[in-house]
């Protein structure tokens, strides 16, 4: 059976939100604690990629390793975070989750894992016609592709996907659970997510 690890991305600036999203309250804890807890039920190892400014606070909240982007790739967005996590944990597959998708379910991680196979480099959902590359699974062979992109100063997840053999998932499992894939980018979206939570 393939080994699978989790990489939680919490290295963004949260500029639209106005404060670090990883530390925002959610279900009697925080976004980052919630995402790690969801992942812990499905993967063997987890690492959190944190922004420098909040690393110590994140370390106090979660019981998994917390690291920053590798120094020479800092500031290069999600690709830098993903490859830093891949370097930290040696695994066959990596489940990527952002810290700002509070509705994500361990059921989704199970679906991702079921779809992985050696013929693919990545497994990515399509929600309402849009690819969601940060709620996806990547094989470790993708690491070299990321390095090549970063060396060319290319930071786009789309550029990575264009170089990969990707299995896209857009079936009923995904479309019936679009809430799993909602990102919270603004205070307004956060307020709405809390309302939706209280109405469940």
Curated annotation (Swiss-Prot):
It is found in: Cytoplasm. The gene is mobA. Transfers a GMP moiety from GTP to Mo-molybdopterin (Mo-MPT) cofactor (Moco or molybdenum cofactor) to form Mo-molybdopterin guanine dinucleotide (Mo-MGD) cofactor. GO terms for biological process: Mo-molybdopterin cofactor biosynthetic process. InterPro entries: MobA-like_NTP_Trfase (IPR025877), Molybde_CF_guanTrfase (IPR013482), Nucleotide-diphossugar_trans (IPR029044). Its cofactor is Mg(2+). Keywords: Cytoplasm, GTP-binding, Magnesium, Metal-binding, Molybdenum cofactor biosynthesis, Nucleotide-binding, Transferase. Coiled coil: none annotated. Mg(2+) binds at residue 100. This is Probable molybdenum cofactor guanylyltransferase. It comes from Bacillus mycoides (strain KBAB4). It holds the Pfam family NTP_transf_3. The keyword Metal-binding applies. GTP binds at residues 9-11, 21, 69, 100.
């Amino acid at each position: 059976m393939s080994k699978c690890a989790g990489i939680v991305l919490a290295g963004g600036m949260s500029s639209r939100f106005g404060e670090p999203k990883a530390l925002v309250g959610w279900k009697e804890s925080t976004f980052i604690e919630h995402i790690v807890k969801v992942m812990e039920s499905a993967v063997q190892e987890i690492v959190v990629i944190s922004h420098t400014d909040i690393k110590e606070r994140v370390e106090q909240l979660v019981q998994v390793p917390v690291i920053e982007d590798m120094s020479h790739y800092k500031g290069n967005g999600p690709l830098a975070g993903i490859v830093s996590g891949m370097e930290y944990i040696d695994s066959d597959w990596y489940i990527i989750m952002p810290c700002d998708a509070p509705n994500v379910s361990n059921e989704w991680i199970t679906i991702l894992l079921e779809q992985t196979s050696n013929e693919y480099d990545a497994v990515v959902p399509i929600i309402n016609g849009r690819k969601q590359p940060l709620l996806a699974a990547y094989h470790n062979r993708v690491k070299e592709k990321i390095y090549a992109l970063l060396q060319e100063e290319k930071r786009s997840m789309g550029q990575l996907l264009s170089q990969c053999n990707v299995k896209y998932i857009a079936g009923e499992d995904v479309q019936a659970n679009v809430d799993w894939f909602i990102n919270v980018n603004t205070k307004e979206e956060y307020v709405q997510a809390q309302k939706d939570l209280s109405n469940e």
